[in-house]
Regions:
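Membrane-anchoring hydrophobic helices of lipid-metabolizing enzymes
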Residues: 1-28, 160-260, 265-276, 300-307, ...
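A cross-family acyltransferase "interaction/gating" segment
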Residues: 2-3, 11-12, 19-20, 30-141, ...
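Short conserved beta-strand segments at catalytic cores or DNA/RNA-binding microdomains
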Residues: 25, 41-44, 277-278
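Short, flexible loop segments at the rims of nucleotide/cofactor-binding pockets, characterized by
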Residues: 235-241, 288, 315-320
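Non-catalytic terminal/interface segments that mediate subunit docking, oligomerization
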Residues: 261-265, 282, 288-291
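Short acidic-hydrophobic, aromatic-tinged amphipathic segments that line or gate anion-handling sites
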Residues: 311-312
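Single conserved hydrophobic/aromatic residue that forms the stacking wall/gate
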Residues: 438-448
Length: 448
């Protein structure tokens, strides 16, 4: 296909660096070289502005308008092309390269220049499945309508391809929060409570925004890179590694399914154990449900950057918080993310499993019940240790018969307790549970 004269390249960005990289790749592979005088390419965005805070112009390119008006337009083959700078986060060999790799965040000219400087030898050009012009010209519509249709088809194609490479886009936390606050359920709850009062409505909107900030994660790949280095040292120096059993089944399940990981909970390190192993096995990092008691100074930011989002122990009669939290779960499922939560609710102090708490399970089931695009699988996981980090604090609690309150000082005192060798650690995946088999009548009946 690409050797014919009917090829039109569609580039997702307006970057001249990307265009020149495509020209070089085309020349190397004896493909048609994109040239302005041949009118065989177009870019969906205008040129990047100089500074990061300036947004690029979204536009329908002049070349696309000319293509639509061409009498032979139906014979043309539009090939979407993506250019990614830098290797995936788990394969980067330097933190500077990681910072300037491609992500969902926008790029300025300066950032693009730095990407070329630090990742110039790691540029990857992807020629995607062609967009057949016959898909566009089957209906007799105006040229402006056909331009918009082509633009939408290409942007959807680029977004799917980018998600396959980078994972779902929740890097822009403000966008996620904005979508939660503008959801129909949150708006309806605010409207019902306000009863027409603009002053009350404004106050409720502020409350909802505060709740969303409190809940949402803020994944940072530079921080995850540091996690990887620190946890790799930890598991191999304080434990005799972290042995994983059954990971091979996860790779197949991750395709076309939303996965809900449900590990046992014996130690604070559980929050990062599963993510560490998924990361090292090139699987998507989950969003982790963490108790609000862990949203402490320093620690809360570290956990949030690793994918944790925070949940209050009890919602009580706070309907607005409940709506915001529920919508957050829905948005995560809609964007294709997996979830990790601890069914026991808290850490076991005795080593025995605690009875599961049905509240979060019920909310998770309810949040994906009306979504038909993906199947949902629960994955039970056992995380066991020969010795746990919190061994000494558990002994103190058993003697006093009082549970110690979480604080940043208690966390660091726990860390200071594990100077010695802690033995072996194991992470084992159980058999997946298909939610569709249990959620037909209603979530509550299924849980019972």
């Amino acid at each position: 296909i690409i050797e014919t004269n009917n090829v039109i390249y569609a580039i997702s960005t307006g970057s001249n660096f990307d265009l020149n990289t495509l020209k070089k790749a085309a020349k190397t592979n004896n493909f048609p070289i994109p040239k302005k005088n041949k009118k065989n390419f177009f870019q969906l965005k205008g040129a990047r502005r100089l500074f990061p805070w300036q947004t690029p112009r979204r536009r329908n390119p002049r070349e696309l308008h000319e293509l639509i008006k061409d009498p032979d337009a139906a014979k043309k083959i539009i090939i979407p092309v993506d250019i990614f700078w830098g290797k995936s986060p788990d394969r980067q060999d330097h933190w500077v390269k990681l910072i300037f790799r491609d992500s969902w965040e926008g790029s300025s000219f300066l950032r693009n220049l730095l990407k070329v400087i630090f990742n110039g030898r790691q540029a990857n050009v992807f020629f995607h499945k062609p967009l057949e012009s016959e898909e566009i010209f089957t209906q007799k519509k105006s040229s402006s309508h056909l331009v918009l249709k082509t633009d939408r088809l290409l942007r959807a194609r680029f977004r799917r391809n980018r998600q396959a490479k980078l994972g779902p886009d929740i890097s822009n936390r403000r966008t996620l929060i904005h979508s939660i606050l503008n959801s129909s359920s949150v708006k309806k709850e605010i409207s019902n409570f306000s009863k027409g009062s603009k002053k009350v409505e404004a106050a409720q909107n502020k409350r909802a925004y505060k709740y969303a900030l409190e809940i949402c994660s803020d994944i940072s790949y530079p921080v995850i890179y540091l996690y990887d280095k620190a946890l790799n040292w930890f598991w191999n120096n304080r434990y005799d590694g972290l042995e994983i059993i059954g990971i091979e089944k996860i790779s197949d399940l991750a395709v076309g399914n939303s996965l809900i990981y449900t590990p046992s909970h014996r130690s604070h390190i559980d929050y990062l154990a599963l993510s560490f192993k998924l990361y090292t096995n090139n699987l998507m990092l989950p969003q982790i449900v963490a108790g609000k008691n862990l949203n402490l100074p320093v620690l809360g930011r570290i956990l949030r950057n690793g994918g944790a989002f925070f949940m209050r122990r009890s919602f009580g009669a706070n309907k607005l918080y409940s709506k915001v939290f529920f919508e957050h779960l829905r948005k995560l499922f809609q964007r294709g993310y997996s979830i990790e939560f601890f069914p026991e609710g808290g850490r076991t102090r005795t080593g025995r499993l605690l009875s599961p708490r049905p509240g979060i399970i019920s909310m998770i089931i309810k949040s994906f019940q009306d979504m038909d695009e993906r199947d949902v699988k629960f994955l039970p996981i056992s995380i066991t240790y020969e010795k746990v980090l919190e061994g000494k604090s558990y002994l103190r609690e058993s003697k006093r018969r009082i549970k110690e309150k979480e604080s940043i000082f208690s966390i660091f005192s726990t860390i200071s307790d594990f100077r010695g060798y802690l033995g072996n650690a194991y992470l084992q995946f159980g058999e997946p549970i298909d939610c569709l088999l249990y959620t037909s009548p209603s979530p509550r009946d299924a849980l019972t």
